[in-house]
């Protein structure tokens, strides 16, 4: 499983990664691969598997709503948090 985080604020990315890692650790689960992006364009250019995606709504260039819609077109099973 891969969890992707897309936010133009790297501090938000770091904090969300810590929360996710802490959740898996506290539940004695193997943490999945965490991948971060600072733009919607770079996330959409990534062709690898996308299981769960956390998106920032307001980003320069492509906003999170647009990116989420594009992800759903490519994979209707992707889970998206905005």
Description of each model-found segment:
Residues 34-52:
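Acidic, metal-coordinating helix/loop segments flanking the phosphotransfer/catalytic sites
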Residues 39, 63-67:
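Acidic catalytic/metal-coordinating carboxylates
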Residues 60:
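The feature encodes the CheY-like receiver
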């Amino acid at each position: 499983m891969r969890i992707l985080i897309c936010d133009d604020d790297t501090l938000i990315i770091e904090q969300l990664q810590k929360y996710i890692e802490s959740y898996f650790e506290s539940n004695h689960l193997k943490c999945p691969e965490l991948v971060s992006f600072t733009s919607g364009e770079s996330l959409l250019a990534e062709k690898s598997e996308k299981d769960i995606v956390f998106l920032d709504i307001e980003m320069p260039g492509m906003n999170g709503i647009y990116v989420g819609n594009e992800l759903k077109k490519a994979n209707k099973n992707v889970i998206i948090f905005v």
